[in-house]
A protein has these predicted regions:
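Mg2+-dependent endonuclease catalytic cores in nucleic-acid-processing enzymes, primarily RNase H-like
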Residues: 16, 20, 24, 63-65, ...
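Short, Φ-rich (hydrophobic/aromatic) sequence segments
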Residues: 1-2, 57, 172-176
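Generic structural signal for beta-strand residues in well-ordered domains
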Residues: 38-39, 57, 151
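ATPase catalytic-site recognition across NTP-hydrolyzing enzymes
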Residues: 1-51
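Generic detector of ordered secondary-structure context
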Residues: 4-5, 56, 141
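An active-site-proximal beta-strand-loop segment
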Residues: 49-62
Length: 179
């Protein structure tokens, strides 16, 4: 039963919404490296934002991930969630970029929820290079998107820069899509 359906086993027998080591993606598929092992300053960093409208913790938070391609891998410098309304979000983004310690070349925003407005306002009020994400994945479900890149992640091609954000991130990965 455990191998036939990992989610059913976790839910019925373990009383948890997702398998402990992960469902769609597994924790062990991600490598964690110290920032001293990665040429941080030579990479082209991008901030990816999945925005939300509210501070209400019953809803999804806004997600912020700074990442870059490195050789054949993808490096995530940080990935955090915040419950922010639009005025706070507009202040947070430039501060988050400047405090990252790297040169963020491009900010990409999911064009849903607050995304379209966010791009327009940031363009008007700052010098941040910002754009809507334009891929076929924007119109797909979260599960479809996860499955589309699972082979890359399962192959150990995603590196997390060691930090306090790693454990909350890996927990979200493990409980996805049920957490």
């Amino acid at each position: 039963i455990r191998q036939a359906n990992r989610y059913n086993f976790s839910g019925q027998y373990m009383q948890t919404p997702s398998p402990e080591d992960g469902g769609e993606w597994r924790k062990e598929w991600f490598r964690i490296m110290d920032k001293s092992e990665i040429p941080l300053q030579s990479l082209k960093w991008e901030l990816i934002i999945d925005g939300a409208y509210t501070k209400d913790t019953k809803n999804d938070p806004s997600g912020f991930q700074i990442g870059a391609k490195w050789n054949n891998d993808y490096v995530i410098l940080s990935s955090i969630d915040k419950y922010l309304e639009m005025p706070e979000l507009l202040k947070f983004i430039p501060n988050h970029i400047s405090s990252s310690g790297v040169d963020v070349k491009l900010t990409l925003v999911e064009p849903k929820a607050s995304g379209k407005s966010l791009v327009q306002i940031i363009r008007q009020q700052t010098n941040i290079n910002i754009s809507e994400i334009k891929t076929i994945f924007v119109n797909s479900s979260k599960i479809e998107n996860a499955r589309a890149c699972s082979h890359f992640i399962e192959g150990g091609r995603v590196i997390l820069v060691k930090g306090a954000w790693n454990e909350p991130f890996l927990h979200q990965i493990a409980v996805f899509p049920n957490g």
